[in-house]
């Protein structure tokens, strides 16, 4: 897409946005996270129902990291070079990704075989990434540096809210509306099916809300004709620029990327195994057709919803802490708290103690979704924010790909296919990430938020979750 001449707004002249404008540009993340958390909470049980063994699960989840690795930098590269006077720069990707992801969510619970579900997960993850990746660059496009913390933390609020509702949906449908949570062998339960239908609606509606209520600034970082010409160089030119950007990555981004490299496997292992582990190890299920399995996976979803509520609430406190301690110290402490939550899961016998474990995970998740991006905000070149956000994602998905391909051996040979021990391993990796964050990231004294974020966030704090 190209445009004729237009007025350019320099990065230094970006106007400050009101709280309502920041909310409008973040609502889409509510829908996107609704879709992500539906699959995180339910794909493990769905695979189990369709006949997967515990050591098969990592490979079946390969879609998430591999599509992130391939799709996000490409979408970042293309969206940096997209402009239309009516549809903007990032919003066309939001729209297309949301429509096709919603279709995949509707079809997913009708899967009749393991490989049909796995194939639909690939479709969902490809177009989920198309919708999601430009949102990070969208914040940097729209907000001045003094509001970057606020923008990314608002995304954390939306992510926490969307994730909590999505994860709790099967439990709510079963316990409030008496929708069945068990089914015949190889059939996905009705409460999971209806959760996916609800998720498809929220995914599409929330993203469309952001698309139609938020305007974008014309690209001002380079003459847009030059960027349009660059976009016509084809795949080879795009790959060349991605490789060049990796070679010239800002030093601080390298260290933050290493922190991400060890953080995300911990979360990935939890999403692999947690729900089914709760059903078998804590509720005592013996097969995927008995009542204990249905109740266990639903309760696990409820605790996952709870950690998203913790994320939502802790996001109000996070600005205070970041202003006082600095971004890197705040992030390191939150990671250690999350690690404690993951490690302690393996020692739980009383199901209600899982809420204590998930409190730690929710605190870490709030920081993971905001602090790394806030630390990056001032070090990326303005003309390459989209592509660098995609590259940053490499260091999330590469360890996840390694886990998908190699954790089968670990489960068989080291963990005796114990799902709870797999979750615990993720906690130890998160400790390593926290140590790297605290000791190796260099942070200037004035690099905390340039002003308190509290005043505007207090308006939201008065609302119910």
Question: How does the language model describe each region?
Answer:
Residues 7-65, 254-259, 263-288:
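Helix-loop boundary and gating motifs at the non-cytosolic
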Residues 70-87, 313-327, 411:
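Helix-to-loop junctions at the C-terminal end of transmembrane segments
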Residues 130-143, 367-381:
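Intracellular juxtamembrane helix-capping segments at the cytosolic ends
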Residues 1-20, 112-119, 130-131, 135, ...:
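Intracellular loop-helix junctions on the cytosolic face of multi-pass helical membrane proteins
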Residues 30, 104-108, 112-131, 353-367:
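Hydrophobic core of transmembrane alpha-helices in multi-pass small-molecule transporters
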């Amino acid at each position: 897409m190209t445009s004729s001449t237009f007025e350019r707004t320099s990065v230094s002249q970006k106007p400050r946005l009101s709280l309502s404008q920041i909310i409008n540009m973040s609502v889409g993340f509510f829908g996107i996270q609704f879709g992500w958390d539906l699959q995180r909470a339910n794909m493990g049980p769905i695979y189990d129902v369709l006949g997967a063994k515990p050591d098969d699960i990592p490979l079946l989840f390969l879609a998430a990291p591999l599509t992130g690795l391939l799709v996000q930098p490409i979408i970042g590269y293309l969206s940096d070079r997209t402009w239309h006077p009516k549809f903007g720069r990032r919003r066309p990707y939001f729209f297309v990704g949301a429509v096709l992801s919603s279709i995949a969510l509707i079809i997913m619970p009708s899967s009749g075989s393991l490989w049909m579900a796995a194939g639909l997960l690939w479709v969902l993850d490809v177009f989920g990434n198309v919708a999601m990746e430009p949102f990070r660059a969208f914040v940097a496009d729209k907000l001045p540096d003094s509001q970057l913390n606020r923008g990314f933390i608002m995304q954390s609020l939306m992510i926490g809210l969307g994730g909590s509702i999505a994860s709790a949906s099967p439990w709510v449908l079963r316990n409030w509306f008496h929708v069945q949570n068990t089914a015949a062998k190889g059939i996905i339960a009705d409460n999971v099916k209806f959760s996916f239908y609800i998720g498809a609606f929220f995914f599409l509606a929330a993203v469309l809300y952001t698309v139609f209520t938020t305007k974008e600034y014309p690209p001002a970082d380079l003459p847009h004709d030059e960027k349009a010409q660059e976009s016509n160089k084809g795949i080879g030119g795009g790959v060349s620029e991605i490789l060049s950007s990796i070679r010239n990555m800002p030093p601080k981004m390298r260290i933050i990327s290493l922190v991400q490299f060890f953080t995300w496997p911990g979360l990935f292992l939890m999403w692999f195994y947690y729900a089914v582990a709760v059903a078998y190890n804590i509720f005592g299920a013996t097969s995927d057709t008995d009542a204990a399995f249905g109740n266990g996976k639903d309760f696990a979803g409820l605790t996952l919803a709870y950690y998203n509520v913790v994320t939502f609430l802790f996001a109000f406190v996070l600005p205070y802490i970041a202003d006082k301690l600095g971004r890197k110290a705040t992030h390191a402490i939150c990671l250690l708290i999350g690690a404690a939550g993951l490690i302690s899961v393996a020692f739980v016998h009383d199901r209600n103690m899982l809420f204590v474990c998930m409190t730690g995970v929710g605190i870490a998740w709030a920081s993971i979704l905001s602090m790394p991006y806030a630390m990056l905000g001032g070090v990326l070149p303005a003309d390459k924010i989209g592509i660098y956000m995609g590259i940053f994602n490499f260091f999330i998905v590469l360890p996840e790909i390694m886990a998908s391909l190699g954790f089968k051996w670990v489960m068989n040979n080291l963990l005796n296919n114990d799902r709870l021990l797999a979750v615990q391993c993720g906690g130890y990796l998160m400790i390593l990430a926290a140590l790297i964050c605290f000791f190796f990231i260099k942070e200037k004294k004035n690099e905390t938020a340039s002003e308190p974020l509290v005043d505007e966030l207090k308006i939201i704090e008065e609302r119910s979750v």
